[in-house]
């Protein structure tokens, strides 16, 4: 018998913009909430997502290639952070000893402005976890604090097999620390870059190398957003980009599963398809 002792509203919206025969690619936005007191458009990043998709009509095709800044939206940052944790700090890669972070507990693995806390009882997390999958009471813990690797995200089984500490939480509600730089200032200081609203690519390699298409994205040139861009490829390395952080935004988005800011990373290769 399975019983559920919590309840929430889960909202998922898919949409695209249309004007005449022109249309954008589909984009998805979603969040979890306990209350229906506020209009959906005021929650999470839905209003900005709708506006961004509207502004992605008639995109320009990127030509050539440059190495520059990648600005990740909060949703895309969460996606990248999930890949980082999966690639370097999760059960499988720690057990089979393929993680490049396996021997780096207590060492610096990221810029000191990066702090990632797993907190299932944070006030922004809707219906968080009270017990782990193994039956332990949950607790918050830091994965990365001020750039230093503090913990892996391990089950009891892998903890017993490897000797590393078990994670105090089975789920992964990440609270990513905000910075003190307004997003507008981050954009204004970007000479050549891309704001990535969605990433479409394969699984990163063991080393953290990634490559894929930047979807629902905007080109930044000379400190200004110059328009939507299509057929842009981005590539880099997950481990290296954490150390190539340029800025963390003051603004954050809470989607009911965690909190994330915008982050800008240098040294990313951006090229036309």
Which residues make up each language-model segment?
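Active-site bordering "gate/hinge" segments
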Residues: 1-129, 136, 145-146, 224, ...
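Dual-mode signal for accessory low-complexity, basic/Gly-rich regions
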Residues: 103-273
């Amino acid at each position: 018998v399975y019983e559920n002792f919590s309840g929430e509203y889960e909202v998922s919206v898919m949409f695209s913009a249309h004007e005449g025969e022109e249309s954008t690619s589909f984009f998805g936005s979603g969040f979890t909430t306990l209350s229906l007191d506020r209009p959906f458009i005021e929650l999470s990043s839905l209003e900005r997502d709708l506006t961004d998709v509207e502004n992605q009509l008639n995109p320009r095709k990127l030509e050539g290639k440059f190495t520059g800044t990648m600005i990740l939206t909060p949703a895309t940052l969460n996606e990248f952070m999930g890949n980082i944790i999966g690639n370097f700090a999760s059960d499988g890669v720690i057990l089979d000893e393929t993680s490049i972070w396996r021997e780096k507990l207590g060492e610096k693995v990221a810029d000191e402005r990066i702090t990632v806390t797993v907190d299932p009882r944070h006030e922004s997390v809707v219906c968080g976890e009270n017990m782990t999958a193994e039956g332990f009471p949950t607790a918050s813990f830091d994965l990365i604090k001020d750039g230093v690797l503090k913990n892996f995200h391990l089950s009891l089984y892998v903890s017993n097999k490897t000797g590393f500490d078990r994670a105090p939480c089975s789920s992964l509600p990440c609270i990513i620390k905000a910075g003190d730089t307004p997003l507008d200032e981050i954009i204004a200081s970007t000479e050549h870059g891309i704001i990535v609203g969605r990433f479409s690519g394969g699984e990163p390699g063991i080393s953290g190398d990634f490559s894929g298409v930047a979807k629902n994205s905007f080109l930044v040139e000379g400190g200004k957003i110059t328009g939507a861009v299509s057929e842009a490829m981005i590539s880099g390395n997950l481990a290296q980009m954490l150390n190539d952080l340029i800025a963390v935004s003051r603004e954050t988005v809470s989607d009911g599963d965690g909190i994330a800011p915008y982050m800008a990373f240098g040294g990313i290769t951006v090229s036309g398809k």
